[in-house]
Amino acid sequence: KFYKTNICDREAIYKIFEDEKPNIVVNFAAESHVDRSIENPEVFLKTNILGTQVLMDACRKYGIDRYHQVSTDEVYGDLPLERPDLLFTEGTPIHTSSPYSASKASADLLVLAYHRTYGLPVTISRCSNNYGPYHFPEKLIPLMIANALNEKPLPVYGKGENVRDWLYVEDHCKAIDLIIHKGTVGEVYNV
């Protein structure tokens, strides 16, 4: 079933847990557009941090076998362009660069705190940019395609030197499924 509700609506989330009795919870809910987070950080903080807390509290109250937090490589910040040999690892320190990345890093830390404090069985995955069917038109790939088809200018961010990694959405889902079923509780996985 699909429930369209606000992740911050504790009553609605608890009702879903009561009705469905899930044993695995995967938190895909997020505000995720960096530029919008700069214009209006409040909605990012509410959804990404407080919404995560509501889910974690529901998991504690109703009991689950596994909670999985879908995060982002944005929590690591930027790699220097002059060092293409560097990569993010699960041990890379958090170094946020926008309200979006700060909200996701905060949610990750909250999830790990619930694991340590309450013993909640959690895993976290941090991925790069996803692409695939039904991609929001504000995101880079659909925006570039739409602009090219409509003979509009293609946006260039900064000096045009930024590098982005891309992950097909179905590959991301397969990785999440693998982490949920084979991953170690309390660990973070880069995808």
Task: Identify what each model region corresponds to.
Residues 105, 130-143, 150-152, 157, ...:
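Glycine/proline-rich active-site loop of Rossmann-fold NAD(P)-dependent oxidoreductases
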Residues 1-130, 170:
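N-terminal Rossmann-like NAD(P)+-binding domain of SDR-like oxidoreductases, especially those catalyzing
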